[in-house]
């Protein structure tokens, strides 16, 4: 089974179990070293604690055992974790919540010969992101069509 199919099955199975105050941020499955790892990234307002991840792991693990036929080709480790400071912005809803925050955006196609922008997300209307970024020593604004975004994540401003 393809990795993307496994991720879709797992996401569909566990989403109902991850309820408020928690938010499912992402699901990843792949090899880390010699082992397969299923990573479930969750968050909540104010941040996620070690106890939260332990509780969610106990809730999610039995659900994964009910997926038939078993989508996992090999044994795997389950990791329930925080998305971290540089959490991915994989949906339009996640981008909307990031308005006012410092973000990193990679594009499929360059705008003014630039494919990577890092700056403050000023607004997002579902179609375009408007960002303020530094070009050497000058502040500039750029309008980025959402469909040209390859990857976006929160960023730490140094």
From Swiss-Prot:
The lineage of its organism: Bacteria, Bacillati, Bacillota, Bacilli, Lactobacillales. Required for maturation of 30S ribosomal subunits. Pfam families: DUF150_C (PF17384), RimP_N (PF02576). One of its GO terms (biological process) is ribosomal small subunit assembly. This is Ribosome maturation factor RimP. Disulfide bonds: none annotated. GO terms for cellular component: cytosol. PANTHER family: RIBOSOME MATURATION FACTOR RIMP. Signal peptide: none annotated. NCBIfam families: PRK00092.1-2. It is found in: Cytoplasm. SUPFAM superfamilies: YhbC-like, C-terminal domain, YhbC-like, N-terminal domain. Belongs to the RimP family. The keyword Cytoplasm applies. Keywords: Cytoplasm, Ribosome biogenesis. The keyword Calcium does not apply. HAMAP family: RimP.
């Amino acid at each position: 089974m393809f990795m993307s199919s496994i991720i879709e099955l797992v996401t569909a199975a566990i989403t109902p179990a991850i309820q408020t105050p928690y938010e499912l941020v992402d699901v990843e499955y792949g090899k880390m070293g010699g082992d397969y790892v299923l990573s479930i990234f969750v968050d909540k307002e104010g941040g996620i604690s070690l106890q939260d991840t332990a509780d969610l792991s106990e809730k999610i693990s039995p659900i994964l055992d009910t997926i038939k036929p078993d989508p996992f080709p090999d044994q795997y480790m389950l990791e329930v974790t925080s998305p971290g400071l540089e959490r991915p912005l994989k949906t339009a809803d996640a981008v909307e919540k990031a308005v006012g925050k410092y973000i990193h955006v990679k594009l499929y196609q360059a705008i003014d010969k630039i494919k990577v922008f890092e700056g403050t997300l000023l607004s997002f209307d579902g179609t375009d992101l408007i960002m303020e970024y530094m070009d050497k020593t000058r502040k500039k604004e750029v309008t980025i069509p959402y469909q040209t975004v390859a990857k976006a994540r929160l960023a730490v401003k140094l």
